[in-house]
């Protein structure tokens, strides 16, 4: 990183706690299980506790040096299991960073600046399996499993005041479409879900900085944000800052999709400074190593890239193993052909050599590599539809069925798997995608890009996809990959990233509410209560984006006095429905009658006024 001071400048905002918030840590059964959450203090003295993905960056007591990386959360747990070993690891090459000349001054400078981020890699001892799935199937509850159980519950106690009305709870009960969501998440439930393959805990043993999280149909819906440099834009500083910015607003995982130079070094900075799981698409870096010529790719180059990234600590790999030679012709009559970058790379290789996809052919060998580091599979949908016209066609579902077969192959070695999904799908076809995935992929977690429900809104595809994301999240998708306003148009900047994340946090939340996930609606009720009581600052602070909520309010009512006013700019002081409703309640309370009786009394009073005024609908106004 060639400008640490620039990075510090970029990071200034992301180190501040969100308004009225403080970091709290909920302890587990052993001293080193400390699960971070965000506590939002309200002006009425009540506290709301919410899931927090921001890591130590919003903890003012945390000392962070990005040149050294974050402190380790999991190292003691990994070492105590006694099934891993440290080893020298592969030697980084200039080609890993997209450079042909190992003596390049820029490369040397990059390596010096990243020296504090280097770690000795670990791997499974000979004959051992270090995956969370293997432990789960062996009946072992790991600290990671206990950690995510605590995290998923979000400190249930504060929610009770909002969930105690039995009539309301019955009326608002969700529909989980066959999911099995318990009222309280226990470590044993987490273990069982991971053992069954219905959930994954992406946590490479070489990413000890990660704060464990779980992805599965029976847990909170998660969201992923994409970052990454390209050959034409962005720097390492910008990508690391974008990582921290993404986590601040709620990204549960982040994918590094870098395709330009300095890929390896950028990944060092990202992994060592990330408390959330990091995913990659290894074929992107492998392609850089062969000068961008897909036909020159080989299994040996791809295998070396997998090991390189596993040693660095990547938590999940997107691999396009389902793009088989026999399926490529199915895309010939599509409106938009093959739109997946990784899918098109593998399709081109298959056609050029007229051979089966080497990722598919070497799948078991690849699984052996992932097993040694506990890297999870994210089986890529290389034949996903790139337009509504191509949704749910045979190319898409032929690949999906193959991914289901590969899932079972991976499970034979206890390697964790999630399945990637579309894409572009009209609303009336969204549920069929979830139904087909559950059937073909044996309930492995589904991870979808949207889907976008219409193709007519470039510049607003965060909205077109947010609609599909909310729907498919309700139907059972475990993680939603965000889409920004720049989708199809360009690389997103930090503002686009924030808009995309907030859009998808909304989609994930409404899906959880619709599924009837225990307790999630309590935050809605807390904000509604604050709104009804005109606690403006609490409204802002309880929202997903306090800054924007406050700014929008202040555009029309900027004075501090407006933040205690019992009205807003929409209706004004005389026509505020909530103010009128409160006045009815106050009237009833002072007279010792019910609200219904107060309303009836008011109606009788107004009726008498109408009669005394002559009983006419329109009363002429006398000239002054």
From Swiss-Prot:
Q: Which reaction does it catalyse?
A: 5-amino-1-(5-phospho-beta-D-ribosyl)imidazole + S-adenosyl-L-methionine = 4-amino-2-methyl-5-(phosphooxymethyl)pyrimidine + CO + 5'-deoxyadenosine + formate + L-methionine + 3 H(+)
Query: Which annotated residues bind Zn(2+)?
Result: 424, 488
- Recorded protein name is Phosphomethylpyrimidine synthase
Give GO MF terms, alphabetically. 4 iron, 4 sulfur cluster binding; carbon-carbon lyase activity; zinc ion binding
Q: Which UniProt keywords apply?
A: 4Fe-4S, Iron, Iron-sulfur, Lyase, Metal-binding, S-adenosyl-L-methionine, Thiamine biosynthesis, Zinc
> Which InterPro entries does UniProt cross-reference here?
ThiC, ThiC-associated_dom, ThiC/Bza_core_dom, ThiC/BzaA/B
Organism of this sequence: Albidiferax ferrireducens (strain ATCC BAA-621 / DSM 15236 / T118)
GO biological process per UniProt? thiamine biosynthetic process; thiamine diphosphate biosynthetic process
Reported cofactor(s):
[4Fe-4S] cluster
What Gene3D superfamilies does the record point to? 6.10.250.620, Radical SAM ThiC family, central domain
The entry's function note states: Catalyzes the synthesis of the hydroxymethylpyrimidine phosphate (HMP-P) moiety of thiamine from aminoimidazole ribotide (AIR) in a radical S-adenosyl-L-methionine (SAM)-dependent reaction.
Q: How is the cofactor bound?
A: Binds 1 [4Fe-4S] cluster per subunit. The cluster is coordinated with 3 cysteines and an exchangeable S-adenosyl-L-methionine.
Quote the EC number: 4.1.99.17
Q: Which NCBIfam families does the UniProt entry name for this protein? A: PRK09284.1, PRK13352.1, thiC
- Binding sites annotated in the UniProt record for [4Fe-4S] cluster: 568, 571, 576
């Amino acid at each position: 990183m060639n400008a640490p001071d620039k990075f510090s400048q970029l990071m200034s905002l992301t180190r501040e706690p969100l308004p009225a918030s403080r970091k709290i840590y909920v302890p587990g059964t052993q001293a080193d299980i400390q699960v971070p959450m965000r506590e939002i203090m309200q002006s009425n003295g009540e506290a709301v506790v919410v899931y927090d993905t921001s890591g130590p960056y919003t903890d003012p007591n945390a000392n962070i040096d990005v040149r050294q990386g974050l402190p380790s959360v999991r190292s003691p747990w990994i070492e105590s299991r006694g099934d891993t070993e440290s080893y020298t690891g592969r030697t980084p090459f200039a080609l890993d960073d997209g450079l042909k000349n190992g003596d390049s001054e820029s490369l040397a400078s990059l390596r010096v600046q990243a020296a504090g981020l280097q770690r000795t890699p670990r791997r499974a001892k000979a004959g051992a399996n270090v995956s969370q799935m293997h432990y789960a199937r062996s009946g072992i509850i790991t600290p990671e499993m206990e950690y995510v159980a605590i995290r998923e519950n979000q400190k249930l106690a504060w929610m009770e005041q909002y969930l105690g009305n039995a009539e309301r709870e019955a009326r608002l009960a969700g529909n989980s479409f066959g999911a099995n969501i318990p009222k309280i998440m226990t470590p044993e439930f987490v273990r069982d879900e991971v053992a069954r393959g219905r959930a994954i805990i992406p946590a490479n043993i070489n990413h000890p900085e990660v704060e464990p999280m779980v992805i599965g149909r029976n847990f909170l819906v998660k969201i992923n944000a994409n970052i990454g440099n390209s050959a034409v834009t962005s720097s390492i500083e910008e990508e690391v800052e974008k990582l921290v910015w993404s986590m601040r607003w709620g990204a549960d995982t982040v994918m590094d999709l870098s395709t330009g130079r300095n890929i390896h070094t950028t990944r060092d900075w990202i992994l060592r400074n990330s408390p959330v799981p990091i995913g990659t698409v290894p074929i992107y870096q492998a392609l850089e190593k062969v000068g961008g010529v897909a036909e020159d790719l080989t299994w040996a180059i791809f295998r070396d890239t997998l090991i390189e990234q596993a040693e660095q600590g990547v938590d999940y790999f997107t691999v396009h193993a389902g793009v088989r030679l026999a399926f490529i012709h199915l895309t010939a009559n599509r409106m938009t052909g093959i739109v997946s970058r990784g899918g098109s790379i593998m399709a081109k290789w298959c056609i050029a050599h007229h051979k089966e996809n080497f990722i598919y052919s070497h799948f078991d060998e690849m699984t052996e590599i992932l097993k040694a580091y506990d890297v999870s599979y994210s089986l890529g949908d290389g034949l996903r539809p790139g337009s509504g016209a191509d949704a749910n066609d045979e190319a898409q579902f032929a690949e999906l069925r193959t991914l289901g077969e590969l899932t079972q192959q991976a499970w034979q070695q206890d390697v964790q798997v999630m399945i990637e999904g579309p894409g572009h799908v009209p609303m009336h076809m969204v549920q069929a995608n979830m139904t087909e995935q559950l059937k073909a992929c044996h309930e492995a977690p589904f991870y979808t890009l949207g889907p976008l429900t219409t193709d007519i809104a470039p510049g607003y595809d965060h909205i077109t996809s947010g609609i599909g994301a909310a729907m498919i999240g309700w139907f059972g998708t475990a993680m939603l990959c965000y889409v920004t306003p720049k989708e199809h148009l360009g690389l997103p900047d930090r503002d686009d990233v924030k808009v995309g994340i907030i859009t998808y946090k909304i989609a994930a939340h409404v899906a959880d509410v619709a599924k009837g996930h225990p307790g999630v609606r309590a935050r809605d009720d807390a904000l509604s209560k604050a709104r009804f009581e005109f606690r403006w600052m609490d409204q802002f602070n309880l929202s997903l984006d306090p800054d924007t909520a406050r700014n929008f309010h202040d555009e029309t009512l900027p004075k501090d006095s407006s933040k205690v006013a019992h009205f807003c700019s929409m209706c004004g002081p005389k026509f505020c429905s909530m103010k009128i409703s409160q006045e009815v309640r106050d009237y009833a309370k002072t007279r010792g009658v019910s609200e219904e009786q107060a309303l009836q009394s008011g109606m009788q009073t107004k009726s008498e006024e109408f009669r005394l005024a002559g009983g006419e609908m329109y009363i002429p106004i006398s000239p002054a």
